[in-house]
From Swiss-Prot:
The keyword Transcription regulation applies. Gene3D superfamilies: Periplasmic binding protein-like II, Winged helix-like DNA-binding domain superfamily/Winged helix DNA-binding domain. Residues 1-59 form the HTH lysR-type domain. Pfam families: HTH_1 (PF00126), LysR_substrate (PF03466). Belongs to the LysR transcriptional regulatory family. One of its GO terms (molecular function) is DNA-binding transcription factor activity. It is found in: Cytoplasm. One of its GO terms (biological process) is cysteine biosynthetic process. Keywords: Activator, Amino-acid biosynthesis, Cysteine biosynthesis, Cytoplasm, DNA-binding, Transcription, Transcription regulation. This protein is a positive regulator of gene expression for the cysteine regulon. The inducer for CysB is N-acetylserine. Thiosulfate and sulfide act as anti-inducers. This is HTH-type transcriptional regulator CysB. The keyword Transcription applies.
Amino acid sequence: MKLQQLRYIVEVVNHNLNVSSTAEGLYTSQPGISKQVRMLEDELGIQIFARSGKHLTQVTPAGQEIIRIAREVLSKVDAIKSVAGEHTWPDKGSLYVATTHTQARYALPGVIKGFIERYPRVSLHMHQGSPTQIAEAVSKGNADFAIATEALHLYDDLVMLPCYHWNRSIVVTPEHPLATKGSVSIEELAQYPLVTYTFGFTGRSELDTAFNRAGLTPRIVFTATDADVIKTYVRLGLGVGVIASMAVDPVSDPDLVKLDANGIFSHSTTKIGFRRSTFLRSYMYDFIQRFAPHLTRDVVDTAVALRSNEDIEAMFKDIKLPEK
């Protein structure tokens, strides 16, 4: 059994059982991957993948267990490399962060600028996607950190640490009837077409929850994953915008009126997540604390030692998080 074979079977699953796509991603040949997978199956005396002709159709029950363990083994191999790197070149390495557009555009720029200045020999890579894609990327080992608000609870294998609370703002054009109001009720908001985030992005679930709680149905006419796109369509008069407050800037958005929505929606919490098996390099601890100053190395280590994310939630229950 070779590590290469374990990597191949994991990557085949990551590429939805498409061996050709797997070969392209690994810069190798399709026959080479197929041969190594067969050799591993022959050695183990069991099928990892069910087949129809030359095509893989599904992972067998035994294969699912083997894939799970293979992921753990490969994660440990990565940890060994990280330990060696920490002792040899503590300020050199790589960091892969998976996050949403809102975090990348509005919450992370200052953090990343300071981090790169401090660690010029660490290559930082950012992947943007939906919260589900982000959590999955970290769960599969394709990213070190997931930073998001939605969907991280779906991945129990991630350690999830609360970073900050945030809420939404209502944005309208100056000529809109709501523009002169000091405050807006959810009943008033329900009277207008809304422009907001796609479901599953940037706290959208809280918007739906607030309307359901009030027995109302929001009239959503346009959704997008990008707050800048939403603001563009608000300017075009398509509807009332509901976006993260941090995404509205009086300097860059002087033509929009920002209305507080704290009385309508409950706050959301952005978290940073990573695999429990991840060996955190010193610069990774530093990145976490730059993003969330209350998450010191000692606090992170204490949280990682807890058994579940429910225990982590309890640990932070009485800690006042920053507001954005």
